[in-house]
From Swiss-Prot:
GO terms for molecular function: structural constituent of ribosome. One of its GO terms (biological process) is translation. Disulfide bonds: none annotated. The keyword Ribosomal protein applies. InterPro entries: Ribosomal_bL27 (IPR001684), Ribosomal_bL27_CS (IPR018261). PANTHER family: LARGE RIBOSOMAL SUBUNIT PROTEIN BL27M, RIBOSOMAL PROTEIN L27. Belongs to the bacterial ribosomal protein bL27 family. The lineage of its organism: Bacteria, Thermotogati, Thermotogota, Thermotogae, Thermotogales. It comes from the Bacteria. This is Large ribosomal subunit protein bL27. It comes from Thermotoga maritima (strain ATCC 43589 / DSM 3109 / JCM 10099 / NBRC 100826 / MSB8). Keywords: Ribonucleoprotein, Ribosomal protein. GO terms for cellular component: cytosolic large ribosomal subunit.
Length: 83
């Protein structure tokens, strides 16, 4: 029974795909209804005026207009103001 025990298996070799999170439009930029403004995990930014929030916390424009980033009560809000 002169067998050699099999060697271990490499424990590396995995890599997850990028999630492409972050702010997608700048302050003062003009957007159309449905445009994605922020992709995030959790509420780093809260929806303000004319902005909706998806199931995965994505913020998107509900109306055409200009993007405005605002801070109220230590919370960051993203709003869209019609022109």
């Amino acid at each position: 029974m002169a067998h050699k025990k099999s060697g271990g298996v490499a424990k590396n070799g995995r890599d997850s795909l990028p999630k492409y999170l972050g702010v997608k439009v700048g302050d003062g930029q003009i957007v159309k209804a449905g445009n994605i403004l922020v992709r995030q995990r959790g509420t780093r930014f809260y929806p303000g005026k004319n902005v909706g929030m998806g199931r995965d916390f994505t913020l998107f424009a509900l109306k055409d207009g200009r993007v405005k980033f605002e801070t109220k009560n230590n919370k960051k809000y993203v709003s869209v103001y019609e022109e």
